[in-house]
Amino acid sequence: LSNEEVSLFIFCDYPSSRGWLETHGYEIFWTQISHQPFPLPTLFRHRTLLQREQHLREFEYIFHFDADVLFVGDIGSEILGEGLTATQHPSASYGNKDIYLGKDPKDIPLPVNSVDEPIWNLNQEWVSHSFEKNKKSKAFIPSEERKKYFAGAFQGGKSDLYIHAMQEMSYNIDTDLGQNIIARYHDESHWNRYLVDNPPKTILPFWYCFPEWEDWQSGVVAWKREVCVPEGKQVKMLCLDKDMHGGYESYRGNAKK
């Protein structure tokens, strides 16, 4: 977003960024939070962000990114829609090389800022594993509504709409906890439930939330080898493989290091 005025809100159990985080001249608003064992930090992410609600309301757009992502491509105004912005989960994607190779990028059926933009492919095994199936959970999605699946790592949109979404998801998560329920994929399950009822105006394709592996620059999704980034497109944001950066315990440890 090189043509936009951007401020960063960082939530961390470390007291400040001094000495270890390069801020690259951005305006930074730092909030120290308490360490919690996994999955509570991700489950409560919206509650955490809402600690800064009044300040966030001063901005036209709010976007949330996981801490373990790396921006590797230019992201521009295509993410700035008139409502919520959601990102296609790589496992719900379809992009066979035979479809894309040899085509002019402008002819690829993946226009920006259209709720129909990505090609979706949710196989039944993955659907049965990913969507919340507990009917008592506020994140439950019945089988007939399991048409799309969005990543939790990159989400946002117009400030008032996204704040309302965070408030409702936080309420639903607390309601679930009151019944001793944690959704299958934590806050991501609640995000997908919310988007069924409140469809996003802007859907970004899976290369805005691409899984890292040794050969990620090939554009092929490691665990879904038939899927690749179309010719003429580039990976925009890399979701880091925790095993390649110290291991899951360094991110999800139950004890403060």
Task: Name these PLM-found stretches.
Residues 21-36, 46, 79-87, 107-109, ...:
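Active-site regions of enzymes building and remodeling cell-envelope glycoconjugates
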Residues 1-44, 51-58, 230, 249-257:
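N-terminal anchoring/stem segment of glycosyltransferases
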Residues 11-18, 71-73, 207-209:
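Short, polar loop motifs at secondary-structure junctions
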Residues 126-233:
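Catalytic core and acceptor-binding pocket of nucleotide-sugar-dependent glycosyltransferases
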